[in-house]
């Protein structure tokens, strides 16, 4: 067996490239989506694809420290696909924020995702502008089969002893965020009369919600609150918990 290696004289090393001198790209809006089903374009859409296609996010920038490359159009709209769950989202947003190619100092951020809604409040296909954003993962959880008989749920707020214990802490530790209400109202007023997409399949599904007038309406735009977490949940009991928690 013969071992060999290549060596390059020190003086012949390639000179270092000069740092980039191009001014950073000014970003007007960052649209954040969590997941995509397949490719960015041309197949079944998830959260990201319709933004890419309809906003013509045709310029691609690799983002090695993030989950996915970013895409941008000529109007300053940038699309960011973060991947599912908090860790990927945090890493992707940080990767973009620290990237010297982009100037985000004047950028507005839209977190645009698919979520469930209470049939007492919204119908399938409706759009909700959030006033408050709640992290449903922060707290304590006791198995519902082992909780006291008078407890409505096994979820307990952080540093509390019982479900929904009052008063709410004056200093929250990441459990909830209040968005700029003037800005939210501006967005709502601008979009409240927009006709949203509908289909026969959606209409047939809405008809199943007898006794829930809002759930049987055509898709509409509304203001509300949103709660997110790492677990997808469903059902009347979980819905009651989410409303009370919010």
Q: What does each of the following model-derived ranges do?
A:
Residues 1-7:
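Bacterial N-terminal signal peptides
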Residues 13-246:
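Accessory terminal and edge-of-domain segments that mediate assembly/interaction
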Residues 9-11:
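Sec/Tat signal peptide C-region and signal peptidase I cleavage site
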């Amino acid at each position: 067996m013969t071992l060999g290696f290549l060596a390059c004289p020190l003086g012949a090393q390639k000179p270092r490239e000069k740092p980039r001198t191009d001014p950073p790209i000014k970003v007007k809006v960052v649209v954040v989506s969590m997941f995509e089903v397949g490719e960015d374009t041309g197949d079944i859409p998830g959260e990201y694809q319709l933004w890419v296609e309809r906003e013509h996010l045709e310029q691609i920038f690799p983002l090695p420290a993030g989950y996915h490359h970013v895409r941008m159009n000529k109007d300053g709209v940038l699309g960011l696909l973060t991947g599912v769950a908090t860790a990927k989202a945090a890493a992707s947003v940080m990767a973009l924020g620290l990237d010297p190619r982009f100037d985000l100092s004047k950028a507005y951020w839209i977190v645009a995702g698919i979520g469930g809604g209470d049939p007492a409040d919204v119908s399938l296909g409706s759009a909700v502008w959030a006033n408050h954003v709640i992290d449903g993962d922060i707290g304590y959880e006791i198995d519902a089969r082992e909780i006291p008989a008078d407890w409505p749920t096994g979820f307990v707020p952080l540093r509390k002893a019982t479900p929904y214990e009052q008063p709410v802490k004056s200093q929250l530790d990441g459990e909830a965020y209040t968005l700029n209400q003037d800005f939210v109202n501006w967005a709502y007023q601008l979009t409240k009369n927009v006709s949203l997409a509908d289909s026969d399949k959606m209409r047939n599904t809405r008809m199943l919600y007898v006794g829930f007038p809002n759930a049987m309406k055509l898709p509409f735009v509304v203001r509300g609150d949103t709660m997110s977490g790492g677990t997808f949940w469903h059902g009347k009991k979980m819905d009651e918990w989410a409303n009370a928690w919010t």
